[in-house]
Design a protein with these regions (language model features):
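Rossmann-like dinucleotide/flavin-binding elements
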Residues: 1-5
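C-terminal substrate-binding/catalytic lobe of Rossmann-fold NAD(P)-dependent oxidoreductases
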Residues: 6-119
Length: 119
C-alpha cells in the first residue's frame, strides 16, 4: 500500500551488539532487498548515501543490544515506522528449533520464506 506513495523516502536502521561482525546484518540486507523490490530504489548502501536511488541502511553496534530493525517511511508531513526489537535471544533459539524441525527429510537450499510458506 505505502509503496505507491512517492512522497515518502525510505530508510532502514539496525542496531546490534558490539560483537556482531557483519555490518549490515543479513536481516537488514533481506529487508532492504524487499523494500527495493517494491519501491523505486535500485540498491542499498550503508548510510549516508547522496544517491536518491540508493536505500540507506544506518547500521550501529552498541553494548547490550540483542537486535533492533526499523523501516522508516519519511515525508515532509509525517514518519511511519515499523520496528522489531529483540529483548533477548530466546526468540532466535526458538526460530532455529522451528527451522530444524521443518527441514527434516528435505534436500536443497531454503530460506525463512520457505519455512514460513511466504513465497
Amino acid at each position: 500500500m505505502i509503496n505507491n506513495l512517492t512522497d515518502y523516502n525510505i530508510d532502514l536502521e539496525e542496531i546490534h551488539h558490539i560483537h556482531k561482525l557483519d555490518i549490515p546484518s543479513g536481516t537488514a540486507i533481506t529487508l532492504a532487498e524487499d523494500v527495493i523490490e517494491n519501491s523505486n530504489y535500485d540498491s542499498w548502501e550503508l548510510a549516508p548515501s547522496d544517491d536518491p536511488k540508493k536505500l540507506d541502511i544506518n547500521a550501529k553496534r552498541q553494548d547490550n543490544v540483542c537486535g533492533t530493525h526499523k523501516v522508516n517511511y519519511n515525508s515532509i508531513n509525517d514518519q511511519i515506522s515499523l520496528t522489531h526489537i529483540a529483548h533477548n535471544r530466546e526468540g532466535f533459539g526458538l526460530g532455529a528449533v522451528i527451522a530444524a524441525e521443518w527441514i527434516i527429510g528435505k534436500k536443497g537450499v531454503f530460506t525463512m520464506n520457505d519455512i514460513l510458506n511466504l513465497k
